[in-house]
Amino acid sequence: MPRPSEPSPYVEFDRSQWRSLRMSTPLKLSEDELVRLRGMGEKLDLLEVEEVYLPLARLIHLQVAARQRLFATTAEFLGEPQQNPDRPVPFIIGVAGSVAVGKSTTARVLQALLARWEHHPRVDLVTTDGFLYPNAELARRNLMHRKGFPESYNRRALMRFVTAVKSGADEAAAPVYSHLLYDIVPGEYQIVRHPDILILEGLNVLQTGPALMVSDLFDFSVYVDARIEDIEQWYISRFLTMRSTAFADPASHFHSYSTLTDEQAVFAARDIWHSINRPNLIENILPTRPRATLVLRKDADHSINRLRLRKL
């Protein structure tokens, strides 16, 4: 529980303390399902789901119910009709963190667990990759070397999308990004129709600014954290694996990397990390960590053993 030191807006837990907060929340995820959710190079197992993600899912479940009661109270005060129980105000969750830290896996596991509660079965997951400017526009703006940095996103379009979902629009459309093509897919959209919960996953979702930002619309947020040196190693390992998987596809934007030797691939991955991903992490992503409701801290083996929950 809280360390007896200086006052902090957080409560810190080790894994043994956190897992006790699961209470009687049942595990409704099979090993086969977990394999499909697990990211490349990650070692997430059902024990970690039980000890880390089930307590988190329980906390979010409780907060969803509390938030709906708050909306009902506000509606009563304003003399407005009570909301349709089949169309609750969507609960928005942000999931942030570096490239290769495992935030996509965290988002997918949360989606799977939260959708198993009968009170909020409609859980949509959207990544901010779809709101990157198309490559042609990035090239026009001389931003191809800054892809993934805040300025490479159409932040107005992202804000319109999240606002539409939050305000109860019948449907909202998110552009689709192809990692194979390394570009937006023209004319293809992910349609979100009044979900109970929307999970928005991306590098910079917790950013702030002088104007309204998507993070201002979040009801809960998670930052997936690790030592920068560990994330670099995970990125390089993933890059090496992708030579024989995603990069091997002739249609891949990075197909030329598939023929690199181990030494060449490590050199290329390290160069990309130090020229793009590490600066983006240090300058833009890491500074948003204090805004997260919950920080999941990973060890070098990808396991989560420390957590920090914001209480204020």
Swiss-Prot record:
Pathway(s) it belongs to: Cofactor biosynthesis; coenzyme A biosynthesis; CoA from (R)-pantothenate: step 1/5
Enzyme Commission identifier(s): 2.7.1.33
Residues reported to bind ATP: G97, S98, V99, A100, V101, G102, K103, S104
Gene Ontology cellular component annotations, sorted alphabetically: cytoplasm
The protein's enzyme class: transferase
Keywords: ATP-binding, Coenzyme A biosynthesis, Cytoplasm, Kinase, Nucleotide-binding, Transferase
Reactions mediated catalytically: (R)-pantothenate + ATP = (R)-4'-phosphopantothenate + ADP + H(+)
Domain of life: Bacteria
Protein name per the record: Pantothenate kinase
Single Gene Ontology MF annotation: pantothenate kinase activity
Family the UniProt entry places it in: Belongs to the prokaryotic pantothenate kinase family.
A GO BP annotation: coenzyme A biosynthetic process
Chief site of localization: cytoplasm
UniProt subcellular location: Cytoplasm
